[in-house]
Amino acid sequence: MIQMQTNLDVADNSGARRVMCIKVLGGSKRKYAHVGDIIVVSVKEAIPRGRVKKGDVMKAVVVRTAKDIRRVDGSVIRFDRNAAVLINNNKEPVGTRIFGPVPRELRAKNHMKIISLAPEVL
């Protein structure tokens, strides 16, 4: 569950290291984002010579959450840390690589480019 002011790791090579959620997209009263949801983030920490710099406001897809993800078969999956992948306005990843595993739930939300770049899909 990601809400405003939540800090997330960045799971791609866009140049950002840490971002902070400043808005959950999908309705004016929406409080929380889950895996596959799009949020607006502010870059809080970035590496030199990256594609993005500190202070940039971008959109991102939540790819890992510390909160449980319940599946239809009754199994539960959770990750150690919250993570997101930065995207542009066309919903394409800014980076060219994705680090770490991503859950299958991204496929249902039509983030196929992220799934194809990920090294492991759980």
Curated annotation (Swiss-Prot):
<comment type="subunit">
    <text>Part of the 50S ribosomal subunit. Forms a cluster with proteins L3 and L19. In the 70S ribosome, L14 and L19 interact and together make contacts with the 16S rRNA in bridges B5 and B8.</text>
</comment>
<dbReference type="InterPro" id="IPR005745">
    <property type="entry name" value="Ribosomal_uL14_bac-type"/>
</dbReference>
<dbReference type="Pfam" id="PF00238">
    <property type="entry name" value="Ribosomal_L14"/>
</dbReference>
<keyword id="KW-0699">rRNA-binding</keyword>
<protein>
    <recommendedName>
        <fullName>Large ribosomal subunit protein uL14</fullName>
    </recommendedName>
</protein>
<dbReference type="GO" id="GO:0006412">
    <property type="term" value="P:translation"/>
</dbReference>
<keyword id="KW-0694">RNA-binding</keyword>
<keyword id="KW-0689">Ribosomal protein</keyword>
<dbReference type="InterPro" id="IPR036853">
    <property type="entry name" value="Ribosomal_uL14_sf"/>
</dbReference>
<dbReference type="GO" id="GO:0070180">
    <property type="term" value="F:large ribosomal subunit rRNA binding"/>
</dbReference>
<comment type="function">
    <text>Binds to 23S rRNA. Forms part of two intersubunit bridges in the 70S ribosome.</text>
</comment>
<keyword id="KW-0687">Ribonucleoprotein</keyword>
<comment type="similarity">
    <text>Belongs to the universal ribosomal protein uL14 family.</text>
</comment>
<dbReference type="GO" id="GO:0003735">
    <property type="term" value="F:structural constituent of ribosome"/>
</dbReference>
<dbReference type="GO" id="GO:0022625">
    <property type="term" value="C:cytosolic large ribosomal subunit"/>
</dbReference>
<dbReference type="InterPro" id="IPR019972">
    <property type="entry name" value="Ribosomal_uL14_CS"/>
</dbReference>
<dbReference type="InterPro" id="IPR000218">
    <property type="entry name" value="Ribosomal_uL14"/>
</dbReference>
